[in-house]
Amino acid sequence: MTISIMGNNVTPIQPNESVNQVKRSPSEAQANFASTLKNAIEDLNHIQLESDKKTEAFASGKIDDLHDVMITAQKSSVTLETTVQVQKKVIDAYNEIMRMQV
């Protein structure tokens, strides 16, 4: 039984040039941050409204699935708590930047 040597078929990993070329102006970065923040707040609002609708529907007897209502309410609660914690971290970071001496 002969064993032949396999060639070196592994090519080295090349750096992704598009990652290195991502340079944004401050206004582009601010616009990106603002749109991300706006989308997160809109998502939170949508989740809160969905939870309210399901809770009202359950209370009025339109739906009987308590499990789904509780999952939606918990999802809403966790999302709100996460948003509040992120807000606190952003404010802390802003205050830290304002304390820096130039």
Curated annotation (Swiss-Prot):
Entry keyword annotation includes DNA damage: no
InterPro entries: FliE
Any one biological process term the GO annotation gives: bacterial-type flagellum-dependent cell motility
Location relative to the cell: Bacterial flagellum basal body
UniProtKB keywords: Bacterial flagellum
A GO CC term assigned to this protein in UniProt: bacterial-type flagellum basal body
MF terms in GO: cytoskeletal motor activity; structural molecule activity
Domain of life, per lineage: Bacteria
Signal peptide location: none
HAMAP family in alphabetical order: FliE (MF_00724)
Protein family according to the UniProt entry: Belongs to the FliE family.
Stated name of the protein: Flagellar hook-basal body complex protein FliE
